[in-house]
UniProtKB/Swiss-Prot annotation:
UniProt topology in membrane: Multi-pass membrane protein
Stretches in topological domain Cytoplasmic: 1-96, 162-297, 348-781, 833-852, 948-961, 1017-1033
Positions with a binding annotation for Mg(2+): D385, T387, D726, D730
InterPro entries, sorted: ATPase_P-typ_cation-transptr_C (IPR006068), ATPase_P-typ_cation-transptr_N (IPR004014), ATPase_P-typ_cyto_dom_N (IPR023299), ATPase_P-typ_H/K-transp_N (IPR015127), ATPase_P-typ_P_site (IPR018303), ATPase_P-typ_TM_dom_sf (IPR023298), ATPase_P-typ_transduc_dom_A_sf (IPR008250), Cation_transp_ATPase_P-type (IPR050510)
Coiled-coil ranges (or none): none
GO biological-process terms attached to the record: gastric acid secretion; intracellular potassium ion homeostasis; intracellular sodium ion homeostasis; pH reduction; potassium ion import across plasma membrane; potassium ion transmembrane transport; proton transmembrane transport; regulation of proton transport
Domain of life: Eukaryota
Family: Belongs to the cation transport ATPase (P-type) (TC 3.A.3) family. Type IIC subfamily.
Subcellular location: Apical cell membrane
Organism expressing this protein natively: Rattus norvegicus
Designated name of the protein: Potassium-transporting ATPase alpha chain 1
Length: 1033
């Protein structure tokens, strides 16, 4: 097979001259070469320089060999499908499963253990070839080491496999079916079978199945919020209205939603060649950043591996110098490595992260990458999208102006009730107008669904008005039926109003009712009177001024404002059955009566303000990054607390002081709103300076490329950046961030694929839960690692004493593996369940460069203080066991050569008793067991002191963490099983030991506990002192 050539292009959707959206392509990476690569580049450029929106219908037909009435020929469609491939976004090339598994088996510590296993196997093979089979220790040790690496590797791979496949359930981006016309026949096919030149039809409620050039449309509006971040519906029509394909109205984009109306058009781009496909390419061109916890563990593994090799090599040289054979010295080197490397550490870390991920999953946070759990805890900046993340992603009626008063509507997510007076006749008239002058309709069969959650066919504004009407009137659709519609003029950009005429519900009243809604200033200019408390009053200058004040007040809140008016048509001029002609306009469209204003906004989620406040308390900066209008963005930012009360922008200060903006000192403004045009003109250093100067930032009208720039600028300031979002336009920034958080319900597939974490309930507040859990797991991992490292010293010192003082070996390699992977792993993991010592959400985020997972105080305290005490306990028990069997300590010194002599069968102890080699081996295994039990008894004290780093263990409580209590009991039970289970001496070299040998290490365990309580007392009493700096880890 030849090497596959591939090229990757990123797309920048930026703002061009005059505020136009422009597309810019940059080549990111190329593989292969020669003429094919150049040709492919030229083809890509041609696709980027799309001019399909400017071509006439006949030119389109010629270009794509299709018909605007009959569509493609079926035979040609099959050829094009073969040439271009399916109409689907190609997923990024994944890592093969065998490579993922191999990585789990070949990390830094794993490589050391493979080498150690190989040395053991070689030693056993040489022993076997020489006929020396007195012990199979080397074979058992090799098999144990291999089993450790394979089992931990399988566990790690399983966790990664679960994480990477969790996204498989989210496949909502590409529509399942599309209506296509081929050879003049209309039928439905899978959307991925569409090709360029296909003639397709779509209606309200459908997703756009490809990039489509509109040929005909009736009231068609699309929702581009997942692409641009704008909540407002966008009209689609056959006319070319802009040079840029991104701004013109006659192109509908792949994966956007058709809200209402119908449209027919030709497919001009499919799959990866669509606009959304190019943004996905931009995301795939962004390299994943290493997570802080991954960097920490990598750093720690490097240190441990380096020290293990250093100690092993040192002892290897010493062993060679005192007369060991090369093979025995290598086995000794391997023993040092096994003793020094915490084999269970990676499994412990993985289990701790998995437990936290599971805990988060129960709170609707799904973690795709386990390491992202801790990263969220160290987050110092959250760059949040607005639409759908901070807001509900649905337009909602927020304010009404009638009877010369602004009334506030209920914008909560359940919209349980309205707070304004509904008894006014003006209110009834306004409600009638907004209900009748509305083309939106509920999908059938939703009577049992709460009104705010019902699916509506219609654009966002009309959907908001319909739901508002349903909540206030009751049955809005039934209300419409009582006022049959006679004629209608749909909203268009020229008139900027919508008008409809209805017959009245009272059969005795023969009049018609004309109702109109639209841009407030356009509606007002068609009115001559205004409805105040049910009475029509002349629309004089006083009322026009009142209207203007209300209009500016609502517009200043960043809300979309519509005006409403009505007119009863005289039955003499317009009798029942009169034929209204919308073309000739044979009815009045001026002299109307103004009923009021209604403003709408995509309101913030109820839980967001509290979540933002918690972030601020936790020292986390929340920055809004949206594609929406700056005024709307600023209003939402202020309502959720991103811009705090009393904070002003430069523009606000200038307005307050009545001075030019350029004369205001920017450092006086706490808040800042930057739009895409301004951002484009800023160089990186200016952006960094703006982020440093203004604590409260809002970015509006941003492109995907600009979101990337913002994330990179925050990272340049040393921040750990989390990015939240749900749209396709968020995916590049989600991938670039230290942690990307996507929305599970409203989120696009591209966003979910790029993210590290998915919020199943789309609730920004869930991020705060994630931050708290992330901080807690870092604290608990620190405690777990401190506990794990402590026993390395009592495991290492027996070999140090063995080779320097020449005593019989106190501890065997297999025994060490049982400590690492059997008895100690359960208490180590149980620390993941430990509750926080204090309110960790009142602390600043940790600095990844300064607050390391394993720092000098932790290593020094674990190794040289607690570890040293455990070593003394082990040797006290070892020498006690030897003395009680007749081997006094002084006799043990220098005894090693005779002790290990296979041929010496009459070695005398301190009482003159003679010991055969088999008896000595039995005693040596007894010493292994004694030293093992000593370490385990001291580790019980160690795990109790690790419950807290600053508070007293009595303050934290001994029994609050029930898992830890169970783990300690389990640890003791395993120790008893290994000591007293029949057959253990022959398999794993564990021997039954006397009861008093269990008691020898207990005073040392008590010393560890008391010593640590004194340390914690000093840390609490002397904050900032030498004691605190050196002994608080």
């Amino acid at each position: 097979m030849g090497k596959e050539n591939y090229e990757l292009y990123s797309v920048e959707l930026g703002t061009g001259p005059g505020g136009d959206m422009a597309a810019k392509m940059s080549k990111k990476k190329a593989g292969g070469g020669g003429g094919k690569k150049k040709e492919k580049l030229e083809n890509m450029k041609k696709e980027m320089e799309m001019n399909d929106h400017q071509l006439s219908v006949s030119e389109l037909e010629q270009k794509y060999q299709t018909s605007a009435t009959k569509g493609l020929k079926a035979s040609l469609a099959a050829e094009l499908l073969l040439r271009d491939g399916p109409n689907a976004l190609r997923p990024p090339r994944g890592t093969p499963e065998y490579v993922k598994f191999a990585r789990q088996l070949a990390g830094g510590l794993q490589c050391l253990m493979w080498v150690a296993a190989a040395i053991c196997l070689i030693a056993f093979a040489i022993q076997a070839s020489e006929g020396d089979l007195t012990t199979d220790d080397n074979l058992y040790l090799a098999l144990a080491l291999i089993a450790v690496v394979v089992v931990t590797g399988c566990f790690g791979y399983y966790q990664e496999f679960k994480s990477t496949n969790i996204i498989a359930s989210f496949k909502n981006l590409v529509p399942q079916q599309a209506t296509v016309i081929r050879d003049g026949d209309k039928f439905q096919i899978n959307a991925d079978q569409l090709v360029v030149g296909d003639l397709v039809e779509m209606k309200g409620g459908d997703r756009v199945p490809a990039d489509i050039r509109i040929l005909s449309a009736q009231g068609c509006k699309v929702d581009n919020s997942s692409l641009t971040g704008e909540s407002e519906p966008q009209t689609r029509s056959p006319e070319c209205t802009h040079e840029s394909p991104l701004e013109t109205r006659n192109i509908a984009f792949f994966s956007t939603m058709c809200l209402e109306g119908t449209a027919q058009g030709l497919v001009v781009s499919t799959g990866d060649r669509t606009i959304i496909g190019r943004i996905a390419s931009l995301a795939s061109g962004v390299e994943n950043e290493k997570t802080p916890i991954a960097i920490e563990i990598e750093h720690f593994v490097d240190i441990i591996a380096g020290l293990a090799i250093l100690f092993g090599a040192t002892f290897f040289v010493v062993a060679m110098c005192i007369g060991y054979t090369f093979l025995r010295a290598m086995v000794f080197f391997m023993a040092i490595v096994v003793a020094y490397v915490p084999e269970g550490l990676l499994a412990t870390v993985t289990v701790c992260l998995s437990l936290t991920a599971k805990r988060l999953a129960s709170k609707n946070c799904v973690v795709k990458n386990l390491e992202a759990v801790e990263t969220l805890g160290s987050t110092s900046v959250i760059c949040s999208d607005k639409t759908g993340t901070l807001t509900q992603n649905r337009m909602t009626v927020s304010h009404l102006w009638f009877d010369n008063h602004i009334h506030t509507a209920d914008t909560t997510e359940d919209q349980s009730g309205q707070t304004f007076d509904q008894s006014s006749e003006t209110w009834r008239a306004l409600c009638r107008v907004l209900t009748l002058c509305n083309r939106a309709a509920f999908k059938s069969g939703q009577d049992a669904v709460p009104v705010p959650k019902r699916i509506v066919i219609g654009d966002a504004s009309e959907t908001a008005l319909l739901k508002f009407s349903e909540l206030t009137l009751g049955n809005a659709m039934g209300y419409r039926d009582r006022f049959p519609k006679v004629c209608e003029i749909p909203f268009n950009s020229t008139n900027k109003f919508q008008l409809s005429i209805h017959t009245l519900e009272d059969p005795r009243d023969p009049r018609h009712l004309l109702v109109m809604k639209g841009a407030p200033e356009r509606v007002l200019e068609r009115c001559s009177s205004i409805l105040i408390k049910g009475q029509e009053l002349p629309l004089d200058e006083q009322w026009r001024e009142a209207f203007q004040t209300a209009y500016l007040s609502l517009g200043g809140l960043g809300e979309r404002v519509l005006g409403f008016c009505q007119l009863y048509l005289n039955e003499k001029d317009y009798p029942p059955g009169y034929t209204f002609d919308v073309e000739a306009m044979n009815f009045p469209s001026s002299g109307l009566c103004f009923a009021g204003l209604v403003s709408m906004i995509d309101p913030p989620r109820a839980t967001v303000p509290d979540a933002v406040l918690k972030c601020r308390t936790a020292g986390i900066r929340v920055i809004m990054v949206t594609g929406d209008h700056p005024i709307t963005a600023k209003a939402i930012a202020a309502s959720v607390g991103i811009i705090s009360e009393g904070s002003e922008t430069v523009e606000d200060i200038a307005a307050r002081l009545r001075m030019p903006v350029d004369q205001v000192n920017k450092k006086d403004a706490r808040a800042c709103v930057i739009n895409g045009m301004q951002l484009k003109d800023m160089d990186p250093s200016e952006l960094v300076e703006a982020l440093r100067t203004h604590p409260e930032m809002v970015f509006a009208r941003t492109s995907p490329q600009q979101k990337l720039v913002i994330v990179e600028s925050c990272q340049r300031l040393g921040a750990i950046v989390a990015v939240t979002g749900d749209g396709v336009n968020d995916s590049p920034a989600l991938k670039k961030a230290d942690i990307g958080v996507a929305m599970g319900i409203a989120g696009s597939d591209a966003a979910k694929n790029a993210a590290d974490m998915i919020l199943l309930d789309d609730n920004f507040a869930s991020i705060v839960t994630g931050v708290e859990q992330g901080r807690l797991i870092f604290d608990n991992l620190k405690k777990s690692i401190a506990y794990t490292l402590t026993k390395n010293i009592p495991e290492l010192t027996p070999y140090l004493i063995y080779i320097t003082v020449s005593v019989p070996l106190p501890l065997g390699c297999i025994t060490i593996l049982f400590i690492e992977l059997c008895t100690d792993i359960f208490p180590s993991v149980s620390l993941a369940y430990e509750k926080a010592e204090s309110d960790i959400m009142h602390l600043r985020p940790r600095n990844p460069r300064r607050d390391r997972l394993v720092n000098e105080p932790l290593a020094a305290y674990s190794y040289f203080q607690i570890g040293a005490i455990q070593s003394f306990a082990g040797f006290a028990d070892y020498f006690t066991a030897m003395a009680q069997e007749g081997w006094f300590p002084l006799l043990c010194v220098g005894l090693r050569p005779q002790w290990e002599d296979h041929h010496l069968q009459d070695l005398q102890d301190s009482y003159g008793q003679e010991w055969t080699f088999g008896q000595r081996l039995y005693q040596q295994y007894t010493c292994y067991t004694v030293f093992f039990i000593s370490i385990e008894m001291c580790q019980i004290a160690d795990v109790l002191i690790r419950k807290t780093r600053r508070l007293s263990a009595f303050q934290q409580g001994f029994f609050r963490n029930r898992i830890l209590v169970i783990a300690i009991v389990f640890q003791v039970c395993i120790g008893c099983f290994l000591c007293y289970c029949p057959g253990m001496p022959n398999i794993f070299n564990f021997m039954p030991i006397r009861f008093q040998w269990w008691l020898v290490p207990m005073p040392f365990g008590l010393l560890i506990f008391v010593y640590d309580e004194i340390r914690k007392l000093g840390v609490r009493c002397c904050p900032g002192s030498w004691w605190d700096q050196e002994l608080y880890y």
